[in-house]
Amino acid sequence: MAIINMSDLDLQGKRVLIREDLNVPVSNGVVTSDARLRASLPTIELALAKGAAVMVMSHLGRPTEGEYNSEFSMQPVVDYLAKALSCPVRLATDYLDGVEVAVGEVVVFENVRFNKGEKKNDEALSKKMAALCDVYVMDAFGTAHRAEASTNGVGLHAPIACAGPLLAQELEALGKALDNPARPLVAIVGGSKVSTKLTVLESLSGIVDQLVVGGGIANTFIAAAGHNVGKSLYEADLIDEAKRLVANAQSRGGDIPVPTDVVVAGEFSPTAAATLKAVNEVGDSDMIFDIGPDSAEALAKIIESAGTIVWNGPVGVFEFDQFGEGTKRIAQAIADSKAFSIAGGGDTLAAVDKYDIADKVSYISTGGGAFLEFLEGKELPAVAMLKQRGA
């Protein structure tokens, strides 16, 4: 089923309601990181260029639903957009019963979570939102995995529901990486716990040629291989699960490589002294915080031979430089690769920034939870809604 794209529609004189992900950090009334706002600008500008009267909505932070709280107001976002766009931008606080908006103007709705029923995808609220527009545009990949009134319900009731350019780009990039990838397909999955990424690991292990695990997740696989992990973070109750994943990978001709050398310390702190050890020499009081240089080189070789790379999660505690060399080497290998690469997840994007490889990654996903759910093979509620409306 085809999804309607905003870029294909005639929007002249139309009231267009765009759901963006404008959930940005704010301090003292000022936006402190504008990445999501910058990402949304081309969609808003395209709607204006097509002659639309533009309304934009988003959540910001986690206010108590149904209650106004100035701390979570969209006003700082409005101030930012007013400078970034060459047109009038204003905040609408009371909009559910109708809002005046002229062609060439942008009205930003107050935080959608101030509306009772937003998170539960309340039908009455969804219908009120839908009545405000001629065209609803879902452009917030970061919230596409949530079935809420502003991301899902409104689209079911609006006259037309379509995907914005940012969402369309995300789906195209993820489809290119997972549905029809250039092989070998290599996935790097890091993070602290196997339990939070278990479904991702299971889903990917069935489609990738090589699965690489890092961070705390790797510790559970190290333990599953029979090595001591000392006081490292790992999940003893998931050792059998890790063994099963390795056996599955090997039955398909792949593997989940375990590090041969690791970087350990006696405590978790920015000043902890790093010690390099072979994986079979980890002591009872050691904590594993990174992979060693031999392991990093082995992973870099795997990445060099890849046709497609999916990266979700660092392989060490890269926030502390003495435990960042493994992630740095992985980042460099991805940057040097000619393969199609996609990176997603908050920690991953922080590593991309730290090692300055943003322009060397083919596509950087804006979604955290949505990116993970896509990797799990789930259909995102917003995508299901857009397919339904495009049919």
Swiss-Prot record:
Question: What GO molecular function terms would the record report?
Answer: ADP binding; ATP binding; phosphoglycerate kinase activity
Mainly localized where? cytoplasm
**Location within or outside the cell:** Cytoplasm
Q: In which pathway does it act?
A: Carbohydrate degradation; glycolysis; pyruvate from D-glyceraldehyde 3-phosphate: step 2/5
* The protein's Enzyme Commission number: 2.7.2.3
SUPFAM superfamilies (alphabetical): Phosphoglycerate kinase (SSF53748)
- Keyword check for Cytoplasm, yes or no: yes
Q: Does the keyword Transferase apply?
A: yes
Annotated positions binding substrate: 21-23, 36, 59-62, 113, 146
UniProt binding sites for ATP:
197, 319, 345-348
Question: For this UniProt entry, what's an example GO CC term?
Answer: cytosol
Q: Which UniProt keywords apply?
A: ATP-binding, Cytoplasm, Glycolysis, Kinase, Nucleotide-binding, Transferase
Recorded catalytic reaction(s): these are: (2R)-3-phosphoglycerate + ATP = (2R)-3-phospho-glyceroyl phosphate + ADP
**What EC class does the entry list?**
transferase
Q: Which GO terms describe its biological process?
A: gluconeogenesis; glycolytic process
- Quaternary assembly: Monomer.
Family classification? Belongs to the phosphoglycerate kinase family.
Please state what the protein is called: Phosphoglycerate kinase
This chain's source organism reads Shewanella sp. (strain ANA-3)
Per the UniProt record, the lineage of the source organism begins with: Bacteria, Pseudomonadati, Pseudomonadota, Gammaproteobacteria, Alteromonadales
